[in-house]
Amino acid sequence: MIPYFVTDGIKVVTTGEQNAIYFQPTVWAHLTVGLGAPSYIFLEVFMKKVGIIMGSDSDLPIVKKATDMLKILDIPFEVHVYSAHRTPVEARDFAVNARDNGFGAILAFAGMAAHLAGAIAANTTLPVIGVPCKGGCVDGLDALLSTVQMPTGIPVATVAINGGANAALLAAQILAVSDADLAKKLDEKRVNDAKVVLEKDAGIMDRL
């Protein structure tokens, strides 16, 4: 195995051979180390992943709104079904190890007694974005309140009920703080979204 370590999104490979495992996107740089004959290490910068956790596979249609948006932005992601109530050990283990496993933000989807986002946030200091899912007797209001009303010290960013796309965009904006290429993609998306609205404006009178 090629020796390497990862720190803050950078894989440092201590070898002169470019045959390490690749992550996408990759940027390689050669650095001279020492004063004698040149030796090299390779720095491989890779985009952090977005973790997506749903409490039940019934939330999948809302999750797909998020994954579709992440695909548009070329952001890698990983999806799991972990319940805060039925599989608390697995949910906790995912959260505890998320940073070391290359995640930069976590989306948590749950309905009704929606404790998933809070349970994840309690076990990581990565940004956690809660997505309350519509369902139950009050059409998702219970999930919204369960997700947003977090105690001081354990924050959860919460989007609208069924707001999977906005959750993905918020995660992208968080990652873009340290990723200029992703920030550019987000800027371009804003411009394209505005063009779509203006095209509709230009043709609205013809529809009356």
Task: Annotate each language-model stretch with its function.
Residues 50-86:
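Glycine-rich phosphate/diphosphate-binding loop of Rossmann-like nucleotide-binding domains
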Residues 58, 141-207:
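C-terminal binding/interaction regions
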